[in-house]
UniProtKB/Swiss-Prot annotation:
PANTHER family linked to this entry: FORMATE-DEPENDENT PHOSPHORIBOSYLGLYCINAMIDE FORMYLTRANSFERASE (PTHR43055:SF1)
Cellular component GO terms, alphabetical: cytosol
TM ranges: none
High-level lineage: Bacteria, Pseudomonadati, Pseudomonadota, Gammaproteobacteria, Enterobacterales
Keyword Flavoprotein: no
InterPro entries reported in the protein's UniProt record: ATP-grasp, ATP-grasp_carboxylate-amine, ATP_grasp_subdomain_1, PreATP-grasp_dom_sf, PurT, PurT/PurK_preATP-grasp, PurT_C, Rudment_hybrid_motif
Stated name of the protein: Formate-dependent phosphoribosylglycinamide formyltransferase
Record-listed Mg(2+) binding positions: E267, E279
Length: 392
């Protein structure tokens, strides 16, 4: 039996978000729908989820002592990480002391860096992956590239949204790629993964929910990336029944091995009927923002339902749908959005995240569309995103 209290009352059910970006904002909204008290934490003030939380705190989430202090102050029933850059050893301690880390502290620690999850997938679960080597110095990095061969990809073991990632075609790129990887790591300079390039037809995110009533799958989400950042996503991605079966089998093994209740974003390469594991996030995925318009329960609603111990039942997908990011480039601490009236309409929506500032290129919103086909939905979403004029 799940007992939920009322926010701001003595018996409130309290959820603490560690990371308060646009994904955390949607999780906070879903918590609010159930009367759950929300505490938003991030490294900067006025982050998107803080706008819709009951309270907020600004801390360095890589500082275990600071993390413990805010947890002891707020006494949350659920700690919900939204990002990788968190003091995961402290999360493990807090979980051992009885706190509920979503989906569990082990999953957060393993997926905090690419090494933990790659070794779990390839070496423990024996799942198909790309070839890979790890390196923690430039000389070992060069040896790893020589072993893997060209082309290959280098990534910091801990980063997100493509930061520090380079597609390497020749030896002339090595020095610059190493330096960029050292700058792009979420916890500073350090270890990298060098991966062989996988030949694939397309990539998918298989949003997978581990809940009290079993494992559930959303329809596969296709996506297009530039420099490691997602530009558009769509649902459903067409694939063969055998490939879908294999994708679900891989995703099921991964989420059950990680443990805990919640939604996981399982990234996979698909080539014909073959499926290769890429990465997993133990939380809602940015490409899954399409589910805000494509499903009866968005990935955020599913995450909240699962970690609160509620059954999922089933997931209804409405048909072809797409998302396209609003990704301006400017510098401002007073951003405005013009021409919004031309970005919305029948079966056409936008979300503006409310980020307090921009310095360069930053994702500030997303357009969402449905249509008779996925191709048309993508075009509608891209057109809508292009209509929004960002100024500052």
């Amino acid at each position: 039996m799940t007992l939920l209290g009322t926010a701001l009352r003595p018996a409130a059910t309290r959820v603490m978000l560690l990371g308060s970006g646009e994904l955390g904002k949607e999780v906070a909204i879903e918590c609010q729908r159930l009367g759950v008290e929300v505490i938003a934490v991030d490294r900067y003030a006025d982050a998107p989820a803080m706008h819709v939380a009951h309270r907020s705190h600004v801390i360095n989430m890589l500082d275990g002592d600071a993390l413990r202090r805010v947890v002891e102050l707020e006494k949350p029933h659920y700690i919900v990480p939204e990002i990788e850059a968190i003091a995961t050893d402290m999360l493990i301690q807090l979980e051992e002391e009885g706190l509920n880390v979503v989906p569990c502290a082990r999953a957060t620690k393993l997926t905090m860096n690419r090494e933990g999850i790659r070794r779990l997938a390839a070496e423990e679960l024996q799942l198909p992956t790309s070839t890979y080597r790890f390196a923690d110095s430039e000389s070992l990095f060069r040896e790893a590239v020589a072993a893997i061969g060209y082309p290959c990809i280098v990534k910091p073991v801990m980063s997100s949204s493509g930061k520090g990632q380079t597609f390497i075609r020749s030896a002339e790129q090595l020095a610059q790629a190493w330096e960029y990887a050292q700058q792009g790591g979420r916890a500073g300079a350090g270890r990298v993964i060098v991966e062989g390039v996988v030949k694939f037809d397309f990539e998918i995110t298989l949003l997978t929910v581990s809940a009290v009533d079993g494992v559930h799958f959303c329809a596969p989400v296709g996506h297009r990336q530039e420099d490691g950042d997602y530009c558009e996503s769509w649902q459903p991605q067409q694939m063969s029944p055998l490939a879908l079966e294999r994708a679900q089998e891989i995703a099921r093994k991964v989420v059950l091995a990680l443990g805990g209740y919640g939604l996981f974003g399982v990234e996979l390469f698909v080539c014909g009927d073959e499926v290769i594991f890429s990465e997993v996030s133990p939380r809602p995925h940015d490409t899954g923002m399409v589910t805000l318009i494509s499903q009866d329960l968005s990935e955020f609603a599913l995450h909240v339902r699962a970690f609160l111990g509620l059954p999922v039942g089933g997931i209804r997908q409405y048909g072809p749908a797409a998302s396209a990011v609003i990704l301006p480039q400017l510098t401002s601490q007073n951003v405005t959005f013009d021409n919004v009236q031309n970005a919305v309409g029948a079966d056409l929506q936008i979300r503006l995240f409310g980020k307090p500032e921009i310095d360069g290129s930053r994702r500030l919103g997303v357009a969402l569309a449905t249509a008779e086909s996925v191709v048309d939905a993508i075009e509608r979403a891209k057109h809508a995103a292009g209509q929004v004029k960002v100024q500052g």
